[in-house]
Amino acid sequence: MDKSKIRNFSIIAHIDHGKSTLADRILELTNTVTKREMQEQLLDSMDIERERGITIKLNSVQLYYKAKDGQEYTFHLIDTPGHVDFAYEVSRSLAACEGAILVVDATQGIEAQTLANVYLAIENNLEIIPVINKVDLPSADAERVKEEIENTIGIDCSDAPLISAKTGLNVEDVLEAIVNKIPAPYDADDAKPLRALIFDSYYDKYLGVVMSIRVREGSIKVGDRIKLMANGSSYEVTELGVKNPKIVKKDQLSAGEVGWVAASIKTIKDINVGDTITTVTNSALHPLDGYKKLKPMVYCGIYPIDTNQYQDFKEALEKMELSDSSLVYEPETSQALGFGFRVGFLGLLHMEVVQERLEREYNLNLIATAPSVIYKIHLTDGTMIEIDNPAKLPDPQKIKFMEEPFVNVKIMTPKESVGDLMSLCQNKLGTYKDLQVVDDNRMMLVYDMPLAEIIFDFFNKLKSISKGYASFEYEMIGYQESQLVKMDILLNGDMVDAFSMIVNKHFAYQRGAALTKKLKELIPRQNFEVPVQATIGNKVLARETIKAYRKDVTWKLHAADKSRRKKLLNKQKEGKKKMKEIGSVEVPQEAFIAVLKLDD
């Protein structure tokens, strides 16, 4: 294959700006799929991806395009997820490319998440082609958006294609720009030892783990013994090939190409995205740059509502782990919810997607506890432990100080929402860093704030304040000391472990009062009075009382029979006292969900 005719590229766009639609048009124009085979968002293979209109797993396709210069070019389109939780997957897929198409909606302009991915592309030295989409809509303002891109990122937009991915208008210009602007693979030398980047992996029940790779140097053939440079394990290549989007088998992939490799690998945990493949004989000396081990940022307990489903739930998690290497879980028990698992996620969207997939694909009925982050607890004896669950917090006497993860948050917002969003960030213990003007209508706010505050209803409030127009992205900046306490909820004097949470001291009273009030509304009245208390240690922060049903035991008495009346009321009082001592309170499922949705 002529290396100078290869073009490897990604499409970068914010959710709903038309990335998957543009990918579909490109597949049509290059005759990769016929109109009859076409289904919307062809590259998004999971139902949930099509429904939510977001790309979660990566996909790569090989296309052939006959350009206006009469030459035929081989394109490798690598689809990337656009959401902040999957930023590492984006950075790995960008590392497999030489160029990126930046799709921006002509009606909305550039968004915070897109900026983050553009900077990732610039870090990977990619050639960026700006494309303005949805120019056929009445509210489109392509000139303003061009100016915005030039001012914010500094990319020349004078000849940016103005397209409508939906109708196919000017999409041909995008293909010509790929040919003329994106460089051919610059380091593609078949003679060097093999170095190939793994940018994605998935599980196939016949082939085992299938790796999506970009061959940087050397070549890889069926029968080769390959070695993963991060952990040193070796395998024999059983099958390899490309996708167009159907799977096509080949004998060999050479430098510059993008394809897939299967090598009878049993579990996806053996494969790390971002790792480098080389051959056992004639090995490369150094892996490719940029490999990172992914760590979950958010944890929560997930339990089956029907305890008989525990085994099914366990098997479902094992199967999901095969296709999602960033998923981490361990068994956990709760007095309130029974047996379940503590599951770790990359972020909130990842958590929602996983839970939805478990319920939808495996017919499970699940309940999740409030999400929490990983806290670092420094003890008085000089040691440090990490916890992701309030139940694991040691005795306060043994704690010297606690640290929590902080993130740098960038918010793109219309000017009229700036004041309210600044108040929101301050209420979430944010530290103001910067305010930048993006264009006449929009500004960018920059804050540092605790990750725990973001996973707690920040996104919903941001959207409601800005009427849906603001967008945000965050990145980890490390751990900082915080005034943290563990808050427990007592029902009738008994602690309910599923309601415990670690909160900032400043918020403890607010959260406690809001939660007790909410639980009072949601827990049905019992035959006895039930106190609902929020406590820190022995100190009660807030209390609500669920009133008892009043049963009239004196209804059949004569009005003058006072001693009999007193006797019956005393008997009822004794009965209630006894009941209160042994009575357990039924907590409905809505109450557990209320903790997650608590709007303080």
Swiss-Prot record:
Domain tr-type G: 4-186
Transmembrane segments: none
Example GO BP: positive regulation of translation
InterPro entries named among the record's database cross-references: EF-4, EFG_III/V, EFG_V-like, EFTu-like_2, G_TR_CS, LepA_C_sf, LepA_CTD, LepA_IV
EC number(s) on file: 3.6.5.n1
GO cellular component terms, semicolon-separated: plasma membrane
Subcellular location: Cell membrane
UniProtKB keywords: Cell membrane, GTP-binding, Hydrolase, Membrane, Nucleotide-binding, Protein biosynthesis
Pfam families to which the protein is assigned, alphabetical: EFG_C, GTP_EFTU, GTP_EFTU_D2, LepA_C
Membrane-protein topology: Peripheral membrane protein
Chain positions recorded as GTP binding sites: D16, H17, G18, K19, S20, T21, N133, K134, V135, D136
Chief localisation class: membrane
Enzyme class: hydrolase
Catalysis performed (reactions): GTP + H2O = GDP + phosphate + H(+)
NCBIfam families given in the database record: lepA, small_GTP
Family: Belongs to the TRAFAC class translation factor GTPase superfamily. Classic translation factor GTPase family. LepA subfamily.
Biological role stated in the UniProt entry: Required for accurate and efficient protein synthesis under certain stress conditions. May act as a fidelity factor of the translation reaction, by catalyzing a one-codon backward translocation of tRNAs on improperly translocated ribosomes. Back-translocation proceeds from a post-translocation (POST) complex to a pre-translocation (PRE) complex, thus giving elongation factor G a second chance to translocate the tRNAs correctly. Binds to ribosomes in a GTP-dependent manner.
Name of this chain's protein: Elongation factor 4
Provenance organism: Mesoplasma florum (strain ATCC 33453 / NBRC 100688 / NCTC 11704 / L1)
